[in-house]
Amino acid sequence: MERTAGKELALAPLQDWGEETEDGAVYSVSLRRQRSQRSTPERSGEGQTPIPATDTFLHYRTSKVRALRAARLERLVHELVSGDREQDPGFVPAFLATHRAFVPTARVLGFLLPPPPPPPPPPAGVDSKRTEGQDLNFSKNLRAVVSVLGSWLRNHPQDFRDPPDHQNLGNVRIFLGWAAPGGAEAREAEKLLEDFLKEAKGEQTEEEKRLAWSGPPRIAQTPGSEFAEDCVEEEGPSSEGPELLDFSVDDVAEQLTLMDVELFLRVRSCECLGSMWSQRDRPGAAGISPTVRATVAQFNTVTGCVLGSVLAAPGLAASQRAQRIEKWIRIAQRCRELRNFSSLRAILSALQSNPIYRLKRSWGAVSREPLSVFRKLSQIFSDEDNHLSSRAILSQEETTEDDDCPSGSLPSKLPPGPVPYLGTFLTDLVMLDTALPDTLKGNLINFEKRRKEWEILARIQQLQQRCQRYSLSPRPPILAALRAQRQLSEEQSYRVSRVIEPPAASCPSSPRIRRRISLTKRLSAKLSREKNSSPGGSPGDPSSPTSSVSPGSPPSSPRNREPPPPGSPPASPGPQSPSTKLSLTMDPPGPWPVTLTPSSSRVPLLGQQTSEARVIRVSINNNHGNLYRSILLTCQDKAPSVVQRALEKHNVPQPWARDYQLFQVLPGDRELLIPDGANVFYAMSPAAPGDFLLRRKEGTGHTLSASPT
């Protein structure tokens, strides 16, 4: 293909071409368009530099690129060692990062490691290291296996943790000792085994000390204990040292950022996979995703501190309580300056929760400037366009730091962070796992799904690398005050809030608190659906994502509103903001393209109804808060089947399905009862968000086993 200069066609460098099947494996085929330079011949005379003429042509070379899309496990492992790294550089990192979603580590090693022959003992006085000639005799596949194992050990060392013996790591260590003795990979395996054993010994020592010095067990108090509530109402938060808000805004924000950074750096990306994270509340799954659970606990601790400090001591005057609200707004602003979006989101969620939001007299005493800051910060996490604002800002923060780095500058000169709100990525992965099948026709592993998961995990890892640039020192007094801050349960928060400002019967506009103060923020999906491909055409058009209706979008932008009059709370960024805890299913995903199989190439978005299906969220009314589960609702689904599937996802015995009723949650605190025999798809309100609630019928008294933990 040739075109004159200045008339170059604006063609994409990589164009989808179709699929190929080879030995039971499915490959996606693309055409890569690469430019090659060609100048005019040299002028007469040797040694002269060629000068391009004005009519120089642009030459392009088109090459065929194949990427494995689906295959059986044996073929995937074979691709690890024999695949073309230049054509498909993302295969190995994607497989290593996501393999635990479809196969255990031991089985992969069973395919990957050939049984090594016993090496002959070296003669006395002869170095056992390989000579250069022996290295050259290594087979290509053997070198590839060693390379894959080296990447695996460096990037995913926790995959080999299997206490107490760490058998998988032992097998790798033996193989590398035979295949690459003295090499970097063998040394990595040795060091990792030493670290695991040392860590286990340290944990055992700490456990022995704890058992030796721990006193009698404390009596656990229920969250709704009247004793705890009386203490909160009469005495307020009690601690021997200073309270958290006694410290400066900068100090508190920096310590919150320090804790968030440490926890985020420990997050194992594979624990964020939707197939793993969605199993966390099942019986016997308490140990799943511990590093992600730690970030959830920290988020909930911060929201609890805000609630406890603002609602404590009901006898405070409205002006005094307003000062506490203002200080938390300034702390949130400082977190934004530190690029800590995790604590920023936690503080805003607490201030927007109903127990604090309903305090009109306290909000009326807040100064105009903090209110303006609060509105601007709240816009970051606005529900508009499926939380597109927070995603755009996070991407802008990442891009800014790359652009601000001059050529040749040291990485230490780059700004640290940002610390993301992990819930966004968790929900992206959960919804991706829900939307795309694990296997395709012929029981082939859908590796295209794993590639899309890897794109999200890779971004998490990039953010972790950037967060290593933070240089913050711990302040033990502030950390102690944070731990000592009294935590209020959701029921306590609401009761104390009503003591501070009793609900006025003559004020119907006062927001009515729901008991469903959720443990989960909105779970919604924005998956870009691909257009039906024509023969020889592109199977998908990522440039045309489908828009999604975001449940609970604000009617108007807070930045355009006038400050509220005295005695009114500030405008909330959304009509529903009761959540005070980090979602376990987290935040809505953003618009990323998803390639689907021809049989399922059109997946409805959460809150968006197609002619045949819709993704809905179903929660269950219990004492654990709202734990939402996503369900694909088709036009054939009747209420009993939807109730049964929802109970199954909430780990409630299915024989109890007849004891439950399904309600659609409508705007304005209204609910729509779905009759038992009705077709849910047609009985629901299509204009309302796809949020549903399961509630026990009157006269039934089963105890639910579902838990948000």
From Swiss-Prot:
Region (Disordered), start-end ranges: 26-55, 203-225, 395-416, 502-604
Biased composition (Pro residues): 552-576
PROSITE patterns assigned: RA (PS50200), RASGEF (PS00720), RASGEF_CAT (PS50009), RASGEF_NTER (PS50212)
One protein family per Pfam: RA
Modified residues (Phosphoserine): 506, 510, 553, 568, 572, 577, 600
PANTHER family tied to this protein: GUANINE NUCLEOTIDE EXCHANGE FACTOR (PTHR23113), RAL GUANINE NUCLEOTIDE DISSOCIATION STIMULATOR-LIKE 3 (PTHR23113:SF220)
Physiological role: Guanine nucleotide exchange factor (GEF) for Ral-A. Potential effector of GTPase HRas and Ras-related protein M-Ras. Negatively regulates Elk-1-dependent gene induction downstream of HRas and MEKK1.
Protein's UniProt name: Ral guanine nucleotide dissociation stimulator-like 3
Species annotation: Mus musculus (Mouse)
Organism taxonomic ancestry: Eukaryota, Metazoa, Chordata, Craniata, Vertebrata
